[in-house]
């Protein structure tokens, strides 16, 4: 477990948010995390969105979220999951990342509000199309 922190900055591209990061945030604390696919390191000439920095801010037991800016950054090889990466690539392709307003833990988010569904978490906003989903661990 992490000590409680006001800021956690992830300095390499990952495919998913980790519970320990969320658990380690103090109330009002911020997590800055680049969610990326592997295409950001394959070709600099590609114009397809392949990574975004997100700011996740703890508000008691809730988490505000918003996309900050596109990124192409070195990947954290140990923090990559092929299924999560495919869901993230699908979410980038469908757009709507600029409407993300919350990170919700658990699986209770209706599909129409979910931009990206991870294993035990979702990035959500106003009603969107069907989410890109990461299936739960077996």
Where are these regions (language model features)?
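SAM/dcSAM-binding transferase cores
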Residues: 39-138
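Helix-to-beta-strand junctions that scaffold the AdoMet/dcAdoMet cofactor pocket
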Residues: 25-26
